[in-house]
Amino acid sequence: MNHQDFLVEIGAEELPPKALRQLAEAFAQGIRQRLEKAQLSFSELTWYAAPRRLAVHVSGLAEKQPDLEVEKRGPALQAAFDAAGAPTKACEGFARSCGTTPDKLEKLETDKGVWLVFRSKQAGAPTTGLLPAIVEESLAALPIPKRMRWGARRTEFVRPVHWIIMLFGEKVIDCEILGLKAGNTTLGHRFHHPAPIEIATPANYKDALKNTGYVMADFEERKALIRQQVEAIAKQTSGMAVIDEELLEEVASLNEWPTALMGRFEDRFLEVPAEALISTMKGNQKYFHVVDAEGRMLPYFITVANIESKDPQQVIDGNERVIRPRLSDAAFFFSTDKKRTLASRLEDLKPIVFQQQLGTVYDKAIRVGKLAAKIAAKIDSNPEWAQRAGELSKTDLATEMVMEFPELQGTMGRYYAAIDSEPEEVSMAQEEQYLPRFAGDQLPTTLTGCAVSLADKLDTIVGIFGINQPPTGAKDPFGLRRAALGVLRILVEKKLDLDLAECVQWAQELHGDLPAENLETAVVDYMLDRFRAWYEEAGVPTEVFLSVLARRPTKPVEFDQRVLAVAEFLKLDAAQALAAANKRVSNILSKEQVDISAESANPELFTEEAEKNLFRALQEKSESARPYIEQRNFTQALQQLAELKDVIDLFFDKVMVMVDDPAIRSNRMTLLASLRHVFLQVADISLLQNKA
């Protein structure tokens, strides 16, 4: 079968930079999936993306689908011919439907008899006839929240489309895509080469754009070049560029022909907190900043221009003129904010509503302060610092700087608290209250920061659950999932042995009357269930998590200790047998409605040696496991209990539990209940059956 290269390019007005990679990858994936579904073989598929284009190059694409052997089954042989061997009407009708005659039909022998069949070869469709639909379907499936129309056209896309390339080998595919006639010409750089460029073959696409059109279509190549240029130009200052990956991705999406240039700003702006300077440079201007060897900010910025200027200094001067007033604004906000203390701004929070049913941001700050103090007392921190930090925690929201740059909340609070001569941990807690912001983010470094972060998150979770607005499906407007996971991470990774149930009670009391019923149970259950995704990501079997959840330990540190112990237990040779035995015991006790307890069986009622052995071994291992359980060394406790495997197996081999004598039967039930109780002190091992 012959093969050709295929190229599709969608030429548009500037595409959304933050969505460019996603659009390109989705477009390529859509084409890949549809080619595979159409059984069109190919050797390689590559995507290209630049501000004004999305393209996919498919190498070695088959010129047509493979031919198919088609088998159509007709009537049974006995119904196809009469006694004289002449075709029946059923046979003739089947032959006509297949476009043939009865003598061309074949026989198919099956377990259910012999049937007439018609076999034919269906020629594969030519690729050029299939590609337009494949491309259109792939475009229609792109993740575009809002599509737009342009001109008098009815077609829709993320941005107006001005040209289309559909090239198979050296031939243009005769079709319309998004209302435009496909061709083999593209456009180069908007300023360097606005004239059309003819693409002779798909393989020439990348080089033709680069060598003639001043366009680097390869996204990763462009991104690597920007990184290289930015790092090189920063060395001219004896400093180094800080390359934020998210910013680099966006800058690569904004430029077709990137050229890095360095500008300078006045040293006086370095008196402003670096985060504020970075925020305006990165957020508004898409600049990279420069630091010295100690990480201190230097008065330089690096911009990436989408043009190779004959007078680069003019471009630099223009950027310096743009950034100067923005930095001046930041300096003004900082100077103005310093004239008032954070404490004096607490009253400014009273008009700001946190949530209609939960009061103002002022109310929340007071609650957070009181809850943080209670938590601090439990974790051997300073309750006074925690309460002070909690009360001040939202005051920077009323500052000019944070109102202009909301992303600096907490960060500016830290600076302003330090300027106000607050204790260092109080200052640090202003920023650390928001940690962790996302999965994998750093945690608070101070105990005061931990206390305030926990208090802030718990106050929100309890409050929102308390007014019956928990997360539903994909909707989580208050970020409760992230907050709950943040609480668990702080408690587990910082080894803070707090009881969630107790903390939720405190938060509930500080909120006052809340309409939700069974609030404490609902919140604790919700938070413990966040562990599910945590352990899945860590590679811990879900059954291990469920075995611990069944016991519902409400201290996250202890919950984690139990999970890790059960995960180790699962590696033991005896694990599966013990899990099966626990399951069997659980079923027996459940069927007979026997309560699980530590009550000891009466040894005088034993009649079988196997039950006597189990009784003695259970007493011995319960005693040896008890100190480990009290010390929460659950790994060692389970290793002790694992030694019961042989006596448990022998018990079930030799002893009939459901005997006629009620006293003996009840005594054996009590023995099994105590066995079940011993394991349940760690986890419900019965849930681990066949999960090793």
Curated annotation (Swiss-Prot):
<dbReference type="GO" id="GO:0005829">
    <property type="term" value="C:cytosol"/>
</dbReference>
<dbReference type="InterPro" id="IPR006194">
    <property type="entry name" value="Gly-tRNA-synth_heterodimer"/>
</dbReference>
<keyword id="KW-0963">Cytoplasm</keyword>
<keyword id="KW-0436">Ligase</keyword>
<dbReference type="GO" id="GO:0006420">
    <property type="term" value="P:arginyl-tRNA aminoacylation"/>
</dbReference>
<protein>
    <recommendedName>
        <fullName>Glycine--tRNA ligase beta subunit</fullName>
        <ecNumber>6.1.1.14</ecNumber>
    </recommendedName>
</protein>
<comment type="subunit">
    <text>Tetramer of two alpha and two beta subunits.</text>
</comment>
<dbReference type="Pfam" id="PF05746">
    <property type="entry name" value="DALR_1"/>
</dbReference>
<dbReference type="GO" id="GO:0005524">
    <property type="term" value="F:ATP binding"/>
</dbReference>
<keyword id="KW-0547">Nucleotide-binding</keyword>
<dbReference type="InterPro" id="IPR008909">
    <property type="entry name" value="DALR_anticod-bd"/>
</dbReference>
<keyword id="KW-0648">Protein biosynthesis</keyword>
<dbReference type="InterPro" id="IPR015944">
    <property type="entry name" value="Gly-tRNA-synth_bsu"/>
</dbReference>
<keyword id="KW-0030">Aminoacyl-tRNA synthetase</keyword>
<dbReference type="Pfam" id="PF02092">
    <property type="entry name" value="tRNA_synt_2f"/>
</dbReference>
<dbReference type="GO" id="GO:0004820">
    <property type="term" value="F:glycine-tRNA ligase activity"/>
</dbReference>
<dbReference type="GO" id="GO:0004814">
    <property type="term" value="F:arginine-tRNA ligase activity"/>
</dbReference>
<dbReference type="GO" id="GO:0006426">
    <property type="term" value="P:glycyl-tRNA aminoacylation"/>
</dbReference>
<comment type="similarity">
    <text>Belongs to the class-II aminoacyl-tRNA synthetase family.</text>
</comment>
<keyword id="KW-0067">ATP-binding</keyword>
